């Protein structure tokens, strides 16, 4: 196994070089001109540009630096409104005002979170081939829009805001996504950019962008930064090291369906129940009333960040009746405490994955409007034993700021040459080997782009074909992970089991696309597959479920893996002996007939036992191997003693073992 270990070291040391070269190559080869940075948020979006050595966050036509991610169609002509204008008319036109497109993008219609959200939205969501689309009235016609199209409309607005400020057309953008977005969601976001007439030169992770905003001017050596990003609809935690312009992500975790919208919803449900209890009337029957309540609840939530209680007052809310209730900060916290506490689990996971202790974290950077909630700040401070989070950056603008810097890096703006961004892949990737074992090639939280190779062999004599099955996930057995693809390497020349050397190479490019190559080292015969962003990629819920399952079933997994490994060890040992006895150049030519027969019978007995004991436990398999060793080792020891220990070494366990395909 020494060769494989060295190979791992070479692959790992190549990672950083590969990443930096990617950046440099991109700069040299393509002239993009101005590249804007866009934070495409669930509830609000923001745009910035890097010029003349600094970032400018650009205000919209209302003078606001953040723009609601809302689209509406109003009036007899179906006029399209985007941003503030769309949000401002929500209560009079709820059925034709679309928001939260980010909670639909890249997801299936039957996704649990989509089905839960549909119950709360005033607009109609329909099923088109298991993909959600929004149906609204445009003038006198019913029209359907995909989440990509709705997001594209918001991106068009952000593009126009930038063009108005710059006084020229903008064609290129860096767009941010939650770190825990899967490939389908990332690809859908890129597609939205294309629909908006933008070339999305890079998709980057929101917490990474925020770290750039925080660390751009920090020149005080290596620092460990935890970015806690709680926005309107998504939640991410990333651990990074920042060292003089090099931003390296160590680990990332999160929940793509947790944010301010969920906190608002809890308060709305509380008031709807309260109103029904007092008046006997159900607010949900009137979409306008619900949206009026939504608007006022959001205002109340914001007010409670700076005061301990606030009044929620709505004139003529339902059936001409006014609504007036007090909401205290304590009640708001009580309604949402489980959601607030749920943010700490990913923080703990990121610390574990980074192999860092709480005391190793130099700075905690809070990003996203929901981090203004005092209880959220308090929980983080308590978790880190009283450490105060940094307040140096604007939580609403930090992500767009970092995206604008990355745009400057790619377009070759001055003063950005020292900035290098090293991000990670969120899940482990590997292949299936004998016994259904998941053999990992690239671990989760590995810096991308990256490349890793490992040598495997065959599981049967004269095997003409091996099937390379590629999986993604954290469980030890492939049946519990997600299959990304498979392909065959054919035309292997006849050879005993364990002799062919098949090198499998995994390469993840800067866009997170996986390329897998298998090569027979003996013949040079090659085959490869590219795993692209198809609809079969995992949803963030799947990712979270896998990691949670892995924790829950760790004990069961260990038993199954131990059993598979014990079986592989016994099989390899038995077949290795069999091959050596049949080889006149090895043991076969050195043993007398009696000893040879003893070993042959012991080996055949072990192989036969394996065949008839498919469900044997790890302990039974280990016992069987010990039994075989007890019969073989005295004979082999005697042979080498007689030869004065001058010959070749006895066949040791693992001497020539490779994982078998």
UniProtKB/Swiss-Prot annotation:
CDD domains: ASKHA_NBD_HSP70_BiP (cd10241). The keyword Zinc-finger does not apply. One of its GO terms (molecular function) is protein folding chaperone. InterPro entries: ATPase_NBD, BIP_NBD, Heat_shock_70_CS, HSP70_C_sf, HSP70_peptide-bd_sf, Hsp_70_fam. One of its GO terms (biological process) is chaperone cofactor-dependent protein refolding. GO terms for cellular component: cytoplasm; endoplasmic reticulum chaperone complex; endoplasmic reticulum lumen; membrane; nucleus. Residues 639-661 are annotated as: Disordered. Residues 649-661 have a biased composition (Acidic residues). It is found in: Endoplasmic reticulum lumen. It comes from the Eukaryota. This is Heat shock 70 kDa protein C. A motif (Prevents secretion from ER) lies at residues 658-661. Belongs to the heat shock protein 70 family. Probably plays a role in facilitating the assembly of multimeric protein complexes inside the ER. The gene is hsp-3. Keywords: ATP-binding, Endoplasmic reticulum, Nucleotide-binding, Signal, Stress response. Residues 1-17 form the signal peptide. It comes from Caenorhabditis elegans.
């Amino acid at each position: 196994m020494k060769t494989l270990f060295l190979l791992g070291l070479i692959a790992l040391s190549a990672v950083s070089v590969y990443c930096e070269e990617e950046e440099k190559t991109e700069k040299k080869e393509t002239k993009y001109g101005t590249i804007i940075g866009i934070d495409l948020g669930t509830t609000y979006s923001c745009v910035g540009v890097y010029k003349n050595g600094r970032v400018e966050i650009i205000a919209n036509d209302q003078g606001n630096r953040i723009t609601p991610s809302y689209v509406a169609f109003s009036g007899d002509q179906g006029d399209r409104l985007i941003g503030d204008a769309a949000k401002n008319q929500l209560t009079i036109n709820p059925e034709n005002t679309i928001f939260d497109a980010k909670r639909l993008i890249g997801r299936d219609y039957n996704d649990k979170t989509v089905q839960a959200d549909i119950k709360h939205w005033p607009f109609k969501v329909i099923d088109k081939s298991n993909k959600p689309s929004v149906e609204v009235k445009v003038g006198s016609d019913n029209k359907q829009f995909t989440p990509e199209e709705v997001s594209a409309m918001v991106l068009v607005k952000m593009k126009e805001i930038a063009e108005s400020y710059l006084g020229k057309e903008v064609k290129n953008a860096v767009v941010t996504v939650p770190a825990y977005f899967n490939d389908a969601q990332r690809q859908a976001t890129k597609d939205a950019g294309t629909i908006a007439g933008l070339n999305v030169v890079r998709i980057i992770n929101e917490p990474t962008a925020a770290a750039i905003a925080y660390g751009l001017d920090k020149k005080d050596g290596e620092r460990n930064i935890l970015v806690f990003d709680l926005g309107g609809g998504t939640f991410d935690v990333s651990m990074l090291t920042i060292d003089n312009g090099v931003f390296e992500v160590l680990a990332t975790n999160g929940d793509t369906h947790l944010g301010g919208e969920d906190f608002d919803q809890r308060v709305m449900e509380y008031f709807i129940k309260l109103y029904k209890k007092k008046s006997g009337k159900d607010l949900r029957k009137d979409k306008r009333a619900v949206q009026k309540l939504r608007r006022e609840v959001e205002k109340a939530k914001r007010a409670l960040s700076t005061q301990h209680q606030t009044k929620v007052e709505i004139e003529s809310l339902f059936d001409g009746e006014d609504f007036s209730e007090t909401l205290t900060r304590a009640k708001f916290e009580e309604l949402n405490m489980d959601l607030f506490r749920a943010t700490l689990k990913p923080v703990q996971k990121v610390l574990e994955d980074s192999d860092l202790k709480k005391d190793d974290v130099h700075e905690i950077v809070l990003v996203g409007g929901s981090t203004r909630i005092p209880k959220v700040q308090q929980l983080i401070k308590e978790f880190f034993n009283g450490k105060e989070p940094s307040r140096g950056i604007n939580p609403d603008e930090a992500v767009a700021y970092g995206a604008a810097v990355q745009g400057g890096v790619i377009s070759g703006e001055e003063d950005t040459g020292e900035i290098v961004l090293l991000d990670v892949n969120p899940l482990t990737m590997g292949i299936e080997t004998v016994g259904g074992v998941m053999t990992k090639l690239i671990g989760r939280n590995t810096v991308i782009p990256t490349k890793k190779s490992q040598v495997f062999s065959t599981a049967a004599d004269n095997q003409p074909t091996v099937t390379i099955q590629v999986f993604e996930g954290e469980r030890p057995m492939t049946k519990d992970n997600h299959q990304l693809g498979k392909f065959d390497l054919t035309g292997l020349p006849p050879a005993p089991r364990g002799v062919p050397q098949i090198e499998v190479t995994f390469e993840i490019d800067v866009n997170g696309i996986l390329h897998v190559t298998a090569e027979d080292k003996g013949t040079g015969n090659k085959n490869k597959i590219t795993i692209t962003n198809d609809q079969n990629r995992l949803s963030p819920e799947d990712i979270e479920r896998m990691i949670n399952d892995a924790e829950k079933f760790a004990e069961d997994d260990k038993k199954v893996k131990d059993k598979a490994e014990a079986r592989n060890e016994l099989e390899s040992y038995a077949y290795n002996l069999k091959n050596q006895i049949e080889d006149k150049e090895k043991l076969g030519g050195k043993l007398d007939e009696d000893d040879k027969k003893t070993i042959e019978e012991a080996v055949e007995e072990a192989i036969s036992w394996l065949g008839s004991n498919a469900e044997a436990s790890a302990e039974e398999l280990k016992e069987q191997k010990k039994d075989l060793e007890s019969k073989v080792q005295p004979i082999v020891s005697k042979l080498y003693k007689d030869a004065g220990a001058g010959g070749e070494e006895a066949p040791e366990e693992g001497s020539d073992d490779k994982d078998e395909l």
